[in-house]
Amino acid sequence: MAVSFTNVSSEAGLKKLDEYLLTRSYISGYQASNDDLAVYSAFSTAPSSSYTNVARWFTHIDALLRLSGVTADGQGVKVESTAVPSASTPDVADAKAPAADDDDDDDVDLFGEETEEEKKAAEERAAAVKASGKKKESGKSSVLLDVKPWDDETDMTKLEEAVRNVKMEGLLWGASKLVPVGYGIKKLQIMMTIVDDLVSVDSLIEDYFYTEPANEYIQSCDIVAFNKI
């Protein structure tokens, strides 16, 4: 089923896309697809960070494209006032054909009038946000940390053990590697996935890395990358 967006170069188009992405990680489905690529390609520059959801989505798709590209087909998407092709976009001849009325059933305006169910769901989300005091619904984030030792004599195996020994709900440690810094010193780069509502990265660093016993090995820790997933 094709979906339509207004011009993402305009303030109105960005605002509506930002509202659409409030409860979604991708344009369609549960993984990056050609639909995301089509909308991504409609941007001449990165969107303003004031459009929180669009900026989060754009950064994530940009990172995926740099890593491995997008492989899923998607459902088809049209972005008005752009020249982005879509596999599900009807030909000009088809648009003028008598059967155009039937095509309209498959051309869904995502920003059209809401149904009663959609209005009710939006009200419930707004109530939940107000009750929790948060600006948006919880999600997950992928975080890359640089963990630095005191000197070249620090046992890096013990340092990594101290890091991975930090366990809490909503925290999952991932891949790691040692990266040379200079003068025989190496730092630990380690990935982690967190549930945003359950884990504060700043608090984790302050409360666990900079206190005993971890601070025997850890001199400092920096957040290198922080991306929504």
Curated annotation (Swiss-Prot):
UniProt cross-references to PROSITE patterns, sorted A to Z: EF1BD_1, EF1BD_2
InterPro entries: eEF-1beta-like_sf (IPR036219), EF1B_bsu/dsu (IPR049720), EF1B_bsu/dsu_GNE (IPR014038), Glutathione-S-Trfase_C_sf (IPR036282), Transl_elong_EF1B/ribsomal_bS6 (IPR014717), Transl_elong_EF1B_B/D_CS (IPR001326)
Name by which UniProt lists this protein: Elongation factor 1-delta 1
Cross-referenced CDD domains: EF1B
Self-association state and partner proteins as the record states: EF-1 is composed of 4 subunits: alpha, beta (1B-alpha=beta'), delta (1B-beta), and gamma (1B-gamma).
Organism of this sequence: Oryza sativa subsp. japonica
One Gene Ontology term of the molecular function aspect: guanyl-nucleotide exchange factor activity
Acidic residues bias (residue ranges): 100-109
PANTHER family, per the entry: EF-HAND AND COILED-COIL DOMAIN-CONTAINING FAMILY MEMBER, ELONGATION FACTOR 1-BETA
The protein's role, per its UniProt record: EF-1-beta and EF-1-beta' stimulate the exchange of GDP bound to EF-1-alpha to GTP.
Pfam families (UniProt xref): EF1_GNE
Similarity comment text for this entry: Belongs to the EF-1-beta/EF-1-delta family.
Residue segments, region Disordered: 80-109
Keywords annotated in UniProt: Elongation factor, Protein biosynthesis
SUPFAM superfamilies named among the record's database cross-references: eEF-1beta-like, GST C-terminal domain-like
GO BP field: translational elongation
GO cellular component: cytosol; eukaryotic translation elongation factor 1 complex
